[in-house]
Swiss-Prot record:
It comes from the Bacteria. It is found in: Cell outer membrane; Secreted; Extracellular vesicle, Bacterial extracellular vesicle. The gene is fhbP. This is Factor H binding protein. Protein is lipidated in N.meningitidis upon growth in radioactive palmitic acid, probably on Cys-20. Belongs to the factor H binding-protein family. Disruption phenotype: Bacteria are more sensitive to complement-mediated killing. Residues 184-274 are annotated as: Domain C. Residues 120-183 are annotated as: Domain B. Changing residue 237 to A: 7-fold decreased binding to fH. No longer binds fH.
Length: 274
């Protein structure tokens, strides 16, 4: 089988696998026409919420990310924009994906599965629920391997220099991981102290329901307000978390957590608003 045919077969496999695996775990998913529109429609400034998301970490240089939904397809490269204005706020939007790399003029499939987007009014994050990867060390064929990771976290960043000077704000939203988007995030920021802390609850695995230890708000290299701290389970450090603050008035947070468990490191997407 030539590589071109192999890539087409991989997309078909991704569609079948994702159709079988989607919708579990009580996930609030976007299944409306907006999925196809996100791939085909031009940007419309009348759309509500964050209108576009630059795919930076989701697609590396020299790679291609092919997304499909409801009969529509589109291929993205590093730095391309996804039309998130067509997606529903505060829900997981699900696309089938294949990730490919070009070698000697040929596209080779690296992995396939489900590409997820969680959008708020001022921020969004992407995640990959991989179902198959290329067995590069042995057969070179696609083999089943389920894994979950976070891609991009982006939006309308809050400048560190424009944070509220005082007061406290509590953010409530979602925490989601592999086959489980039923988690809840609660995070409180003390703007006077420039510090935040919170917790993740209601995920299926008890060891993923963790405390997000108090951590300072700091400026990153672009002067965006960000928070990085430790994850605690039964008061023991079990990983780390990072959050960006988004919106002109610090209305939202979005980020991720990495939790060490008996089955390895688990990745969790985080998003919440005041």
């Amino acid at each position: 089988m030539n590589r071109t045919a192999f890539c087409c077969l991989s997309l078909t496999t991704a569609l079948i696998l994702t159709a079988c695996s989607s919708g579990g775990g009580g996930v609030a998913a976007d299944i409306g026409a907006g999925l196809a529109d996100a791939l085909t429609a031009p940007l419309d400034h009348k759309d509500k919420g964050l209108q576009s998301l630059t795919l930076d970490q989701s697609v590396r240089k020299n790679e291609k990310l092919k997304l499909a939904a409801q009969g529509a397809e589109k291929t993205y490269g590093n730095g391309d924009s996804l039309n998130t204005g067509k997606l529903k706020n505060d829900k997981v939007s699900r696309f089938d994906f294949i990730r490919q790399i070009e070698v000697d003029g040929q596209l080779i499939t690296l992995e396939s599965g489900e590409f997820q987007v969680y959008k708020q009014s001022h921020s969004a994050l992407t995640a990959f629920q991989t179902e198959q990867i290329q067995d590069s060390e042995h057969s070179g064929k696609m083999v089943a391997k389920r894994q979950f990771r976070i891609g991009d976290i982006a939006g309308e960043h809050t400048s560190f220099d424009k944070l509220p000077e005082g007061g406290r704000a509590t953010y409530r939203g979602t925490a989601f991981g592999s086959d489980d988007a039923g988690g809840k995030l609660t995070y409180t920021i003390d703007f006077a102290a420039k510090q935040g802390n919170g917790k993740i609850e209601h995920l299926k695995s008890p060891e993923l329901n963790v405390d997000l230890a108090a951590a300072d708000i700091k400026p990153d290299g672009k002067r965006h307000a960000v928070i990085s701290g430790s994850v605690l389970y039964n008061q023991a450090e079990k990983g780390s978390y990072s959050l960006g603050i988004f919106g002109g008035k610090a209305q939202e947070v979005a980020g991720s957590a990495e939790v060490k468990t008996v089955n390895g490191i688990r990745h969790i997407g985080l998003a919440a608003k005041q």
